Amino acid sequence: MVMAILTRQSRRKHLRVYNPPQQAAEVRYTPSATNSSAVPPVAVPPKPTADTILGKQYEDVRSVYSFGKELGRGQFGVTYLCTEIASGRQYACKSISKRKLVSKADREDIRREIQIMQHLSGQPNIVEFRGAYEDKSNVHVVMELCAGGELFDRIIAKGHYTERAAATICRAVVNVVNICHFMGVMHRDLKPENFLLATMEENAMLKATDFGLSVFIEEGKMYRDIVGSAYYVAPEVLRRSYGKEIDVWSAGVILYILLSGVPPFWAEIEKGIFDAILHEEIDFESQPWPSISESAKDLVRKMLTRDPKKRLTSAQVLQHQWLREGGEASDKPIDSAVLSRMKQFRAMNKLKKMALKVIASNLNEEEIKGLKQMFMNMDTDNSGTITYEELKAGLAKLGSKLSEAEVKQLMEAADVDGNGSIDYVEFITATMHRHKLERDEHLFKAFQYFDKDNSGFITRDELESALIEHEMGDTSTIREIISEVDTDNDGRINYEEFCAMMRGGMQQPMRLK
């Protein structure tokens, strides 16, 4: 009942932000018919611009902020560094193209995200919302600039790591969950990429930055649309009947990765990941788990309990003896190889996607018949790329009943280079059956692509050069992956090692000995 009240109150509260701003109203003077003096002025409030998303008049965000460099690019828009003209303070501005918000659901998603950001703003570990603006072409969301970078990047750069450090990070993540749930919000997409550090300082605060899939909790409602990211999704999401408990599961997956460097459930394809989430036992046997404290493992188990009714609540997690400030988390360094595994986990998918893309670009017409026509049918403007809108429309024509969120996830998975559209090779890579892509002749062509000098080996320089050319990873990360693939330790990757990397799972080559 408390949640329902909070939700209703928060919705009423949010709607105020979209009222017409308190600016000078138009003043109309009506001359008197019998008197030369004017009657008192009648204020006529400005009318909201027709067909707005935010329900208020258009405003020029550039009259308040000056825009600088691009910080990132996503499916619906671009994030820029911006500076408040009056104060000189720097913020981030996400500019969302209205042209890409083609459906009523798209527009409602943006409204809801802004409402939730404003509702949660000012709370610890949550990015501060500054304001929302709308003009003819875009919706602009101005928020706190988190200049400290991604969570995992900071951990890896630091080079040493303890259970206590993992507990501090996990406490911040679970605190976000606790705040969201207390304030009537379910996040639905907790993952490390959605957390940034506020500054470059050593003890910078961790901030949750993305609420695009979040919803206001409706008491008694069971949610059914599949949302989230594969490694972090809770089993009840896959069963299409879930509530806010899913956020604790996702936080538990993050904790498992913080302690071991890899996710608890993995596979080469999404279906395999989902099967593991539903049925497999959590691995506490392989390294580094024997050296991790029993208290830490106890918390992971209780956060990753498959029955949501038996899973700890966010408030209970914060009270766990391992997680509490000054609690049982050890200050003894965790094996440094965990950092290496964490780095590989972040980059391995990019490496394999790159190789698969090379293979897809070399498939012959016979192997891709049907897929080429499907691509052309979806590419309605003949641009050579498929936009989100075209993908959604094309899937609908094929009889797909995927939700908006599921189509967005398909788009993100297929869009390897992250430019917001799917090119022909990306489409083939995503739709071709994996066993065809992994046939010997295709793997050999991919091997030859990297083996520029036809020496029969891929050197570190060759693979680094190819991956940097396609902006798929940084040099240090690539070196570590090559070291893992190079099982005979001769400093090069031969064809057998390359095939093993492509066909094998992520977990086995990344296990600590």
Curated annotation (Swiss-Prot):
Residues 329-359 are annotated as: Autoinhibitory domain. Its EC number is 2.7.11.1. Ca(2+) 3 binds at D451, D453, S455, E462. It is an enzyme of class 2 (transferase). ATP binds at L71, G72, R73, G74, Q75, F76, G77, V78, T79, K94. Belongs to the protein kinase superfamily. Ser/Thr protein kinase family. CDPK subfamily. This is Calcium-dependent protein kinase 2. It comes from Zea mays (Maize). The gene is CPK2.
